[in-house]
Amino acid sequence: MKRYIIALISLVLVSFDSGKTFAQQELLNTAAAAYDSAQYQRTIDAYEQIATQFGVNPELFYNLGNAYYKQKNYPKAILNYERCLLYDPSNVDAKENVELARLQCVDKIEAIEPMFFVTWSNGIRDSFACDTWGMLAIVFFLLFIVGCGTYFFTHRTARRKLGFYSALLSIVLCLICIHYAGAQRDHILQRDYAIVMTPSVIVRSSPAESGTQLFTIHEGLKVRVRSTLSGWSEIELTDGQVGWMPSEGLEVI
């Protein structure tokens, strides 16, 4: 009897999963057809429904970015391209498209370049997604085991040397991959960057309307959120300027 119950439960679960897959594919087909026929709002609605029901992924954010770009909703396009790059920093098309969208925005702020080694390290980190770094770490760890096996279980000097240096190189590369997998994960979880969604907003010296007006920024600008307080966000621009603006005018990447 127990076997029949288990089989029945398995059948129900498989049927449920197949139903989800079919429903998701139907929505993807709807979104693609709507995009091809220039019905961009319908495309957006379909992708948003997929995100709500089935979760998000880089391709979904990229397609949403394209639909918003076609609508000339550049802040939303930038937001979704940035979200795509957060999960898949190696997506070249998203990198190009987000720069095209930024050209349509008002603010053109010169960024302060970080130290060269920070840029270099971040570039390495963004070469792969977190999962890819993790897979590479596993591969190098397996090569480390093979190298150790070669060193300990062979008697020829040349092979022992090859095994030793292979194991040494593999464990170093494994640790590097683990480091960048962690760095990429922290980068995703930190979520301290946001896109300005308000057409124009005055940035103030304190979290209150009575604060001194420092400067004005516009929709589509990417900022770093340093802290929040009572409906206000302390933001930092890429040129180092800092101030407070209403949190409702921001959408976190």
PLM ranges: what are they?
Residues 36, 189, 196-225, 229-230:
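Beta-loop motif signature
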Residues 160-184:
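Internal/C-terminal transmembrane anchor helices
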